[in-house]
């Protein structure tokens, strides 16, 4: 494995949606998530991490060191079993730990070495937690917050029709079937994230190669994830703040506050990324540099 990163990073993701549903709320009939007090749209951190995982899985195709632990419809025990088989562990995990007190660390290192998303985001590995192993919970160096739209959004419920009929009985009664879908006409969303070099060194071994793949995955996370429900989505810009040290040279909030998004003059209802201007206030704190990608 490559050496762990030595620098802390904080970053801002700007992405937009046009005539789509960026993240449906199952508790609200799959309506786009909205902050009820402000009317601003929300996208969960879990949703964004899923996009990143999907991109890595697609681009790396299960290459050694880049497997994905959290997969759709795949039991986690299958991946857990690979670690136990590699280490020759059979039967009761508590008994195995008594025989080998270093078993916790060995399992954790195997999982971090082989699964990119554990190395990046961490994981709760239930099999090992139930076996009373300390390696069952791994805290990852990369963390994301919820994305929030820059301006309030107004979700619309669109009625659609289908010419196909489901059953023979329905065919005798009606000629079409009705359906509904939610869309956001336009919304620019902002998400903020963190990369801890300290956790990378102490826990998962997240490397410079992993970091480069993370930036690539963020920039392209919607490019291979198209669907009729999501409409037109794109990452417009990734703004990265690099610290000259492991623990950082400035509080993250000061760097995030430096990223300012304003509506252009005369724009009352934004319908395009071109309706906004994005700036990074300077000078930045000493020991911090900014890289803008996208």
Residue ranges and their predicted role:
Residues 1-294:
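RNA-binding basic/glycine-rich loop and surface signature characteristic of RAMP-family CRISPR effectors
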């Amino acid at each position: 494995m490559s050496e762990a990163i030595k620098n802390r990073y904080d970053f801002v993701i700007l992405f937009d949606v046009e005539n789509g549903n960026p993240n449906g709320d199952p508790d609200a009939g799959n309506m786009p998530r909205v902050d009820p007090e402000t009317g601003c749209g929300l996208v969960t951190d879990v949703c964004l991490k899923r996009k990143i995982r999907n991109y890595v899985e697609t681009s790396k195709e299960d290459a050694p060191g880049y497997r994905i632990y959290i997969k759709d419809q795949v039991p986690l025990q299958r991946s857990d079993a690979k670690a136990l088989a590699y280490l020759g562990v059979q039967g009761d995990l508590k008994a195995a730990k008594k025989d080998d007190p270093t078993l916790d660390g060995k399992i954790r290192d195997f999982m971090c070495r082989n699964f990119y998303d554990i190395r990046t985001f961490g994981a709760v590995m239930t099999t090992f937690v139930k076996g009373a192993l300390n390696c069952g919970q791994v805290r990852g160096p990369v963390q994301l917050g919820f994305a929030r739209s820059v301006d309030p959004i107004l979700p619309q419920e669109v009625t659609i029709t289908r010419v196909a009929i489901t059953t023979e009985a329905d065919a005798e009664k009606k000629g079409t079937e009705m359906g509904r879908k939610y869309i956001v006409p336009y919304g620019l969303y902002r998400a903020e994230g963190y990369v801890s070099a300290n956790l990378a060194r102490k826990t998962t071994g997240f490397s410079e190669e992993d970091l480069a793949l993370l930036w690539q995955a963020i920039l392209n996370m919607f490019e291979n994830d198209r669907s009729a429900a999501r409409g037109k989505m794109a990452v417009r810009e990734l703004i990265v703040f690099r610290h000259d040290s492991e623990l950082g040279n400035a509080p993250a909030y000061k760097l995030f506050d430096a990223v300012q998004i304003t509506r252009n003059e005369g724009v009352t209802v934004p319908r395009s990324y071109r309706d906004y201007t994005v700036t990074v206030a300077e000078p930045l704190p000493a020991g911090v540099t900014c890289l803008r990608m996208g």
